[in-house]
Amino acid sequence: MQDRECEEIIETAEGPSVCAPSEQHAERETSAFQEECAYGMKVWIRLPHDEALAAVRHALGERGFTIACEMDVGRLIRDKLGITYPGYTILGVSLPDAMHQALELDRDMGLILPHHVIVYEQSAGSVIAAVDVIAEMAIADGRDLREIARVSNEKLREVINLASSGVGFEA
């Protein structure tokens, strides 16, 4: 994938951005590239929405996450507004141990839990994105919460890497 193609895909998704150099893309068989966004991390992969969503579910399970809730945004918009909308799914996910620890430190943490992972159709493929848990939990104070957020964030990064690499996954 050429640098200009990457820039066009990102611009289509959210305005101007810069993609990593093309030689880094040659190493990835899935034609994926990852970037940070203001409040999360994301990767574009050359898979349709349903296959990308299946890969994410698999990767979440592999990394110990529980899917607490799921919202099919495309269907919701179609059903409630009568507007055709491309595939867009929001998953509410948590690491049970981390959630328990956070709630023991601050019962009101439930206001920002679970963490969100999204999968949506974009430019002949899909985007997989996850919230930056450190940024999400920054509104709460406490050194112990920062460590819980750091661990959760690292595991979400692993989920995105695993889902975009196709390692150990068959649709």
Where do the protein language model's features map onto the residues?
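A generic structural signal for well-ordered coil/turn residues at beta-strand boundaries
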Residues: 37-39, 87, 113, 124
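Beta-strand/loop substructures that line and gate deep hydrophobic ligand-binding cavities in soluble
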Residues: 116-142
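N-terminal beta1-alpha1 ligand-phosphate binding loop
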Residues: 8-9, 15-22
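Well-ordered alpha/beta subsegment
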Residues: 139-171
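Short glycine-/small-residue-rich flexible loop motifs, especially phosphate/cofactor-binding loops
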Residues: 57, 75, 157
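Compact, glycine-rich, soluble single-domain proteins
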Residues: 63-119
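Terminal, regulation- and interaction-focused segments at domain boundaries
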Residues: 19-63, 161, 165, 169-171
